[in-house]
Amino acid sequence: MKIIAIRIGDRYGPEYEKYLEEKLPQHEFIWIRKPIREDVLLQWNKMYGMSLDIEEPIVVMDIDVLLINNYDDLFNYPIKRGQFISIPGWWRDTENKRYKINGGFFKYYPKDCKYIYDKFM
């Protein structure tokens, strides 16, 4: 499975990449180190995965995730075509309780989400 992670700028050093690659050697990393377009703000670069023309699910994750215990279960969590999986948000920065996803970890089939990329990018 491919994992996409963003490391743009100097807030996080290459040791963060090394940490994730050592924890997840069975996966292929795609590192986004510069904006996919000049007009794209940092967090929106995560949408790059939705533009990929591949038939397998991918994970898009934050670079500053600490992997502990049996984290393979998270990456191996089953997903069906048409599903979009995220871990729950642990903070409440809004009063709307319907907003539950965490932007730090997504799993989806890129081709199923291409329409989102096309609409917003």
Predicted regions and their residues:
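The conserved acidic donor/metal-binding loop of glycosyltransferases
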Residues: 62-66
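Short aromatic/hydrophobic "clamp" motif used to bind/position activated sugar donors
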Residues: 58
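Residues that flank catalytic or metal-binding motifs in active/ligand-binding sites
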Residues: 46, 61, 101-104
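Catalytic core and acceptor-binding pocket of nucleotide-sugar-dependent glycosyltransferases
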Residues: 108-121
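Conserved donor-nucleotide/metal-binding helix-loop-beta segment in metal-dependent transferases, i.e.
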Residues: 67-101
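N-terminal anchoring/stem segment of glycosyltransferases
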Residues: 1-43, 54-55, 110
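Conserved hydrophobic/aromatic beta-strand scaffold that supports enzyme active sites
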Residues: 47-49, 84, 105-107
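A short acidic, amphipathic alpha-helical/loop segment
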Residues: 19, 49, 70-74
